[in-house]
């Protein structure tokens, strides 16, 4: 019994340490912020006038010159009413030497019609994927990002 508890405790500490290490690796290589924008008209993306949706805009700035691109395989909002259906991977390219900033967006949908969501600032997203480097092997990452502001305000 005690051995089983020690094993579970050890595994829990190992997975927690591994996740923190992946977040540090990501933060060392790239700086990323997330903005959001709701659709202007109901049904603009889906055709269903009762569905509210919008986009998350990922703004990335590389800190490591050897970073070629970021491949995002999974986006999970930490809000019960939001859903991201990622039908294909997201690639944030940094191919040119002078290009240190790049943006990419993904659509989200509000699942619950009774929920009124007006402001997503301070919300969080879990993302996971791979960092691809020029002369190193790819490094997987999982991190949590905070939603900073509306997309229009971030551009001004």
Residue ranges and their predicted role:
Residues 85-117:
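Intrinsically disordered, low-complexity Pro/Gly/Ser/Thr-rich segments with frequent PxxP/GP/PP motifs
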Residues 56-58, 70-75, 104-110, 125-131, ...:
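Hydrophobic beta-strand residues in large extracellular and virion-surface proteins
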Residues 7-9, 14-15, 57, 107, ...:
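Intrinsic disorder/low-structure terminal segments
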Residues 1-31:
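A eukaryote-biased signal for short, well-structured alpha-helical docking elements
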Residues 19-93:
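N-terminal topogenic membrane-targeting module
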């Amino acid at each position: 019994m005690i051995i089983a508890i020690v094993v579970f405790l050890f595994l829990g500490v190992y997975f927690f340490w591994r996740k923190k290490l992946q977040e540090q690796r990501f933060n060392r290589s790239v700086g990323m912020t997330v903005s959001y924008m709701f659709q202007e008209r109901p049904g603009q993306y889906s055709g269903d006038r009762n569905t509210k949706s919008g986009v998350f805009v990922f703004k990335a700035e590389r800190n490591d010159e050897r970073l070629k691109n970021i491949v995002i395989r999974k986006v999970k909002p930490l809000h019960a009413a939001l859903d991201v259906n990622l039908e294909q991977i997201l690639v944030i390219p940094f191919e040119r030497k002078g290009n240190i900033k790049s943006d990419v967006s993904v659509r989200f949908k509000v699942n619950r019609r009774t929920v009124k969501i007006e402001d997503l600032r301070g919300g969080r997203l879990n993302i996971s994927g791979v960092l691809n480097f020029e002369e190193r092997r790819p490094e997987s990452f999982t991190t949590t990002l905070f939603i900073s502001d509306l997309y229009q305000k971030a551009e001004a």
